[in-house]
Amino acid sequence: MKIKIFVLIAFSLSLSNLLFAQELTAKKMSEQAVLKENPEDAVKYIQSVIGNISVLAEKKAAYAFLGTLQEAMALYADAQKSYSIAAGITAGNAEGMPKKSSERLVIDAVRCALSAGDYENAKNWLNSAVRNSKSEEIQATVKLYDQWCALSSAESYEQTIEPVAMLKAYLEVPSMQIQKPAVLLTLWYITGEKTYSQMLENEYPLSPEAAIATGKAQIYPAPFWYFVPRKIE
């Protein structure tokens, strides 16, 4: 009888542990993460439990959340890896979490790769299926990031002439209007021409790009912005 009771208890504990692992969702994980004392502890917590998530949609959302947190902490290389893992998981959206398509996650990975100064990885992701996206927003972002890749690989200001010319042309392309603030900010930063900062202030006065160009905010520290060649008077 004692043996039977022991077996039943052991089975119950095993079943309880299994159910706990199955019940861990991206939403529950994120809720626990934000209760940590600091972002570093939140990241460590997520990394310690993310392997317990078995449902693909939940795992995808969990890695996307981890990438978002790492990007906010300027851990761009780590964020790029997290976004990449999420993008590679074929699944729908998790309940209670931000909805992100695989295409959007690829774009997130590209942005972080560029922020980390890893333009080779960024180019590889841009040359994936995302280039054939049916989303106008994604297509516009791909075109913008293509030029950012070119700027990242430039070793002199002269090598920025071609991507700058492309960015100037994009200002007149209707499908690129969604990225116009970013295009204007890039042109202002690279060329130093006040025309672009004035356009930002006039057309997008409340945008983060306008705040940066007018000195009300600073560009977030990232290798892309620090090492890309630019014209300095």
What are these regions (language model features)?
Residues 19-61, 209, 213, 225-233:
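N-terminal leader/linker segments that initiate helical-solenoid repeat arrays
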Residues 26-29, 63, 106, 143, ...:
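TPR repeat positional signature
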Residues 29-32, 66, 109, 146, ...:
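Structural register within alpha-helical repeat arrays
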Residues 33-36, 70, 113, 150, ...:
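Residue at a conserved register position within TPR or TPR-like alpha-solenoid repeats
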Residues 48-59, 88-99, 131-139, 171-177:
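Flexible helix-coil transition and linker loops at the boundaries of alpha-helical arrays
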Residues 186-233:
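Terminal, low-structured helical/coil segments at or just beyond the last alpha-helical repeat
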